[in-house]
Each structure stands twice: as structure tokens, then as C-alpha cells.
Amino acid sequence: MRVSILAVGRLRTGPEKSLIDDYLTRFDRTGRALGLGPARVVEVEDKKNAGMGAEAALLRKALPAGAVLCTLDERGKQLSSPDFADRMAGWRDTGRQDLALVIGGADGIDPSLRAEADFSISFGAMVWPHMLVRVMLAEQLYRAATILAGSPYHRV
């Protein structure tokens, strides 16, 4: 199952991008034998600053056809890392070819796009900068792959 992180805004070269690249490389390497990956980051940018509706339209264009649509939103469900791994395995095992994890812009995700989501995940009630959410999500993808592989990376 291919994984796409769809995000509003551009991430500049720096420590956050290095961390994301590292975790996604690890995910690809670990997930390959599990039917997970490759992972990619797709950035969309509303250059006209037309708001959440315009961002949602750009995100919809970037969605792979037939993908599981999972938003990252403070109103979403909080999952443990093993629960996230199980959810990913479940989507993979039902034959889904693509998973799209969507990170909104500064104002969040347009309500119409949130309503279309198959699932929504929250990293807690706090609001996080999009660059940190990308890092946290990339790490959780790698952690999920190691959990499914039985690797000792995730310790309880």
C-alpha cells in the first residue's frame, strides 16, 4: 500500500525535512516486506491565499484515485502507536492500494474535505505547526512498520 502525505505549504530544507526524509526512508525499507510503501510527501500551495476551500481543492487534486483518505485533525481519534499500526494493516489487508494522510494549512482542513475522510487522527488537543506534524507522522509511519515487523524499535 503506497502512502502519500499530502500537506499544505512548502517545507524548506532544514532539520525538519532531514528528519522526515530519514523516517520515510526507514519506513520504505522496513515496510517493503510488509506490503507498505513507498511513502512520499506531496506539497500543495494556495498561492492566491484563497483559504481553506482552495486548499481543499488542491488537496483533492493530489489524492491518489481510490485512496483511503485519513485527515490529521485535532477533532480526530487519538490512537496508540500499535492501534495506528493495526489500522494501517487493516487498510492494506482489505486491498487498498493507497493511503493519503492529509495535513491542512494554518486554518486547518476545510470541513467539506474532513467530511469526506475515511478516518481522522488527532495527535492530541493541542495544535501543532505543520512542519512538526509532518515529522511526527513520518516517525509514526516508521514505528507502525516496525511494530508490524516485530522489530524492537517500539518498546512498551
From Swiss-Prot:
Compartments where located: Cytoplasm
Binding site for S-adenosyl-L-methionine: L72, G104, F123, G124, A125, M126, V127, W128
Enzyme Commission number(s) of this protein: 2.1.1.177
Disulfide bonds: none
Sorted UniProt keywords: Cytoplasm, Methyltransferase, rRNA processing, S-adenosyl-L-methionine, Transferase
Pfam families: SPOUT_MTase (PF02590)
GO cellular component, one term: cytoplasm
Catalysed conversion reaction: pseudouridine(1915) in 23S rRNA + S-adenosyl-L-methionine = N(3)-methylpseudouridine(1915) in 23S rRNA + S-adenosyl-L-homocysteine + H(+)
Gene Ontology molecular function: rRNA (pseudouridine-N3-)-methyltransferase activity
Group of enzyme by EC: transferase
The keyword Repressor is assigned to this record: no
Matches recorded under Gene3D superfamilies: 3.40.1280.10
Superkingdom to which the source organism belongs: Bacteria
Keyword flag Cytoplasm: yes
Similarity section: Belongs to the RNA methyltransferase RlmH family.
Alphabetized HAMAP family for the sequence: 23SrRNA_methyltr_H (MF_00658)
Biological role stated in the UniProt entry: Specifically methylates the pseudouridine at position 1915 (m3Psi1915) in 23S rRNA.
Oligomer status and interactors: Homodimer.
Name of the molecule in the record: Ribosomal RNA large subunit methyltransferase H
Naturally occurring in which organism (per UniProt): Ruegeria pomeroyi (strain ATCC 700808 / DSM 15171 / DSS-3) (Silicibacter pomeroyi)
